[in-house]
Amino acid sequence: MNIDSHTFLLGMQYLGAGLAAIGCIGGGVGIGTVTGKAVEAIGRQPESASKVMPTMIMGLAFAEVTSLYALFVAIMLLFVK
């Protein structure tokens, strides 16, 4: 099987972008976990909502940033020559 170098590099570029996009899964799992635990905490102690919500929002932001970085890397691999 003969593959020219351009086709091989293009295939590796797509493979790398796909693997980088897998990092978005971690962000989704993290956001779901953080939100679920915050809802449980507020359900148990409704008076703690004012303390739980800011912490939850910080956790959501950190989880989302990792997904955005993974998406950025995947897009860079696809469209930058």
From Swiss-Prot:
Q: What domain of life?
A: Bacteria
From the record, give the transmembrane residue ranges: 14-34, 60-80
Tell me, in one coarse class, where this protein mainly resides.
membrane
The record's subcellular locations are:
Cell membrane
GO CC terms, sorted = plasma membrane; proton-transporting ATP synthase complex; proton-transporting two-sector ATPase complex, proton-transporting domain
Site positions (Reversibly protonated during proton transport) are: E64
Give the keywords, sorted: ATP synthesis, Cell membrane, CF(0), Hydrogen ion transport, Ion transport, Lipid-binding, Membrane, Transmembrane, Transmembrane helix, Transport
Name a GO molecular-function annotation.
proton-transporting ATP synthase activity, rotational mechanism
- Fetch the InterPro entries from UniProt: ATP_synth_csu_bac/chlpt, ATP_synth_F0_csu, ATP_synth_F0_csu_DDCD_BS, ATP_synth_F0_csu_sf, ATPase_proteolipid_c-like_dom, F/V-ATP_Csub_sf
Q: How does it sit in the membrane?
A: Multi-pass membrane protein
Similarity field: Belongs to the ATPase C chain family.
UniProt function note: F(1)F(0) ATP synthase produces ATP from ADP in the presence of a proton or sodium gradient. F-type ATPases consist of two structural domains, F(1) containing the extramembraneous catalytic core and F(0) containing the membrane proton channel, linked together by a central stalk and a peripheral stalk. During catalysis, ATP synthesis in the catalytic domain of F(1) is coupled via a rotary mechanism of the central stalk subunits to proton translocation.
Q: How is this protein organized at the quaternary level?
A: F-type ATPases have 2 components, F(1) - the catalytic core - and F(0) - the membrane proton channel. F(1) has five subunits: alpha(3), beta(3), gamma(1), delta(1), epsilon(1). F(0) has three main subunits: a(1), b(2) and c(10-14). The alpha and beta chains form an alternating ring which encloses part of the gamma chain. F(1) is attached to F(0) by a central stalk formed by the gamma and epsilon chains, while a peripheral stalk is formed by the delta and b chains.
Q: Entry's HAMAP family?
A: ATP_synth_c_bact
Name of the featured protein: ATP synthase subunit c
Taxonomic lineage of this organism? Bacteria, Bacillati, Bacillota, Clostridia, Eubacteriales
